[in-house]
Structure formats: structure tokens, C-alpha cells
Amino acid sequence: MIQITRYKEIFAPASPSDRTRAFEDYWAYLLTRDGALQEEVQSLEYKTHYYQSLQTRPVRTQQPLTQVQTMAELSDLLATQHSPRADRRLLALTAIYKFASHEAAGIRAAWTATPPWERCQNLTDRITRYHLCEEFCHLRLFAEMFKVCRLQVDWPPLSWLARTAYGTFARFPGWCLDPIAFGSEVMGMMFYRHTWHALEEVFAQEPEVLRRLHELLAEIMVDELGHIGERRSFLGNTGVKVAR
């Protein structure tokens, strides 16, 4: 008889020991999936190898999608056009760019607000630092998505107000930060799921390009799904109620 493993739903009650065990299991999974942390280059061992392998098997659109060279220029161009006939491929790429730009700002703020590896005092500190290196790797994968479409990206600094807001948020106490961070991870996954289907529609005529974009997005989504579980493990009963 087939045994079906039943898992708790994400908002199910979890004791402190349950959450501690979840952190330990997640840490073991991280080391198996991505290898050693490379803090000096804000990367991870196996993700570095994966990114290098992408450079040996490049995929590009058959023709440039636009005359501009960078995502920043494309974003500015579309903002001035307001055309209902705008290329939907460019609109999809710009949505990804704007999302990833805010991700970049938040990651940089969190990187400066968290202790470096040698000063991490416990497992959750190490997981947090590892998590941030994953996010830096995701920025490289986003850049690779744009490169597939013959566009370059240079993550711009946000305004002083936005940088200050992100920096302040990264320094919130855990009881305040954790429910918000959990909700942010869930919303991010919803964005990625929508993006997955949007890419299917707009790049249907270039199957090789679509496969590469999906490959890159899937690499990000697997990590983000793990981040949802990680963030849930930070939440006690009160945090779960706030997150809901």
C-alpha cells in the first residue's frame, strides 16, 4: 500500500522545538544544494559553477527586441510612450527589472545590517547570511535573463529616501520584521508564478529563449520557496497571526 506523506499547512502551530528542527533541516538542505558560502564575492559554491556553465551555453533572441542597450534605458523609454501597442516582451522584461531593482536595494541594505560570517553567533545568523548570498546570486540570474534578450543591466541606486527606508526596515527587531518578511516572500512567489505564465505567452514564438528564461526563473523560484519555509520558522504563534 502506498504511504502518503502528509505535511502541515504553512500556518499550522509549531513549537519552538519544531522550528529549531526546521532550521537545522533547512541548513543541511542549503549546504547540499548550494555548497559553501563565498562571502567575499557574495556568492555560493554551486551557484557560481552554475552561472559559469551558463556562459558556455549562451542563448539569445534571434533579433534585438529594441534599439536601446540597457534595462534602465528601456524602462525610461516605455515610461514616456504609454503606448497600448508596446511589445509585450519588453513590458514583461521591464516588470521583472523593476521588481529586481527593489530586491537589489533591499538585499544591499540587509547585507550591511547583518553580521559578517565570522561574527555569526548562531545557526539563524548563518542562515540569514547564506540567504543574502542566494539573493545576490538571483540578481546575476535576472541579469542573465536580460542578456538572453540582448539587454544589459546595472542595478541603479535608489533615492536617498528609498535607501533609508530599506536600511531602517532591515534593522527592525525580529518580532516586527519577521511577519513582514514572511509576507514579502509569499508575495514574491506569487509574482514569479505570474511571470512564468507571462513569459510563456510573450515568448511562445522563440521556444529556445523561453526554455532558458524558464530555466533561470526556476532556479530562483526553488530558492524562494525555501525562503518561505525559512521565514515561517522565525514566526511564533503571535507572528503567525500577524502574518495572516
Which residue ranges define each predicted feature?
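Non-heme di-metal
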Residues: 1-244
